[in-house]
């Protein structure tokens, strides 16, 4: 469970790797909790839906869903009911990840639905323009992630630092309440420090930690320079 604290923020997306499924997911979440307790960094995890309930009831860090569908309870077989992820113990959700894109009107509907349930929202975007549009919808977070860098090991802060800086500036001009995160290619302490130096409040990452030989050690390295 648990509320989302102040910066710095590390959001660990479990995606659908076997390394972050079932027992592995629980182990990863507990390791994340240990790092959060040892360092004071606000670490949040996004497990797969079937793992939310167990993880949310066994760790004391925020657990969020990877997606919600903008549906009401009823005949929607296979859909992700927002009330269900809340009942399972999630305190928020990703929206519009590059691997689960939705239309702008769906982003708007998902934010409003999440707000009505008290779920925090992290909207993923791919450029400055999309980030600015998302900011008008009043999410809690916008995470800028150029899709070509996701999983590349090349952090956006290196080839395109201006994207982060201009996204932060644009969003804060539109809606200063929205907190900006940086994603794509993040894996080291230098990457996180650079993201914060560019004006973001934290990072969204996955494979750099999930697929590491020692995920806990990788997380400790990630937060070592802030």
Swiss-Prot record:
Active-site feature positions: 97 (electrophile), 145 (proton acceptor)
Residues forming coiled coils: none
Predominant place of localization: cytoplasm
Catalytic activity: D-glyceraldehyde 3-phosphate = dihydroxyacetone phosphate
Biological or metabolic pathway of the protein: Carbohydrate biosynthesis; gluconeogenesis; Carbohydrate degradation; glycolysis; D-glyceraldehyde 3-phosphate from glycerone phosphate: step 1/1
CDD domains hit by this protein: TIM
Keywords: Cytoplasm, Gluconeogenesis, Glycolysis, Isomerase
Places the protein is found: Cytoplasm
SUPFAM superfamilies named in the record: Triosephosphate isomerase (TIM)
GO MF annotation list: triose-phosphate isomerase activity
Recorded GO CC terms: cytosol
UniProt: substrate binding residues: 13-15, 150, 185, 206-207
EC number, UniProt record: 5.3.1.1
Gene Ontology terms: biological process: gluconeogenesis; glyceraldehyde-3-phosphate biosynthetic process; glycerol catabolic process; glycolytic process
DNA-binding as UniProt keyword: no
Similarity remark: Belongs to the triosephosphate isomerase family.
Subunit composition and interactions: Homotetramer; dimer of dimers.
Stated role: Involved in the gluconeogenesis. Catalyzes stereospecifically the conversion of dihydroxyacetone phosphate (DHAP) to D-glyceraldehyde-3-phosphate (G3P).
Name recorded for this polypeptide: Triosephosphate isomerase
Provenance organism: Methanobacterium bryantii
Upper lineage: Archaea, Methanobacteriati, Methanobacteriota, Methanomada group, Methanobacteria
């Amino acid at each position: 469970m648990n509320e989302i604290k102040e910066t710095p923020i590390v959001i660990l997306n479990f995606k659908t790797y076997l390394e972050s499924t079932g027992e592995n997911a629980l182990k990863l979440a507990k390791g994340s909790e240990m790092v959060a307790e040892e360092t004071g960094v606000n670490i949040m995890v996004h497990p797969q839906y079937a793992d939310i309930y167990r993880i949310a009831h066994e760790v004391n860090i925020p657990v969020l869903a990877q997606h919600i569908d903008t549906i009401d309870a009823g005949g929607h077989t296979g859909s992700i009911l927002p009330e269900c992820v809340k009942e399972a113990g999630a305190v928020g959700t990703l929206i519009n990840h590059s691997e689960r894109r939705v239309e702008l009107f769906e982003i708007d509907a998902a934010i409003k639905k999440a707000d009505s349930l008290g779920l925090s929202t992290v909207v993923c975007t791919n450029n400055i323009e999309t980030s600015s549009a998302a900011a008008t919808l009043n999410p809690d977070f916008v995470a800028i992630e150029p899709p070509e860098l996701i999983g590349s090991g090349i952090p956006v802060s290196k080839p395109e630092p201006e994207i982060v800086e201009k996204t932060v500036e644009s969003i804060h001009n539109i809606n200063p309440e929205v907190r900006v995160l940086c994603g794509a290619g993040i894996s080291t302490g230098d990457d996180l420090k650079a993201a914060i130096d560019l004006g973001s409040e934290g990072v969204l990452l996955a494979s750099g930690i999930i697929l590491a030989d020692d995920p806990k050690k990788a997380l400790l390295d990630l937060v070592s320079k802030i």
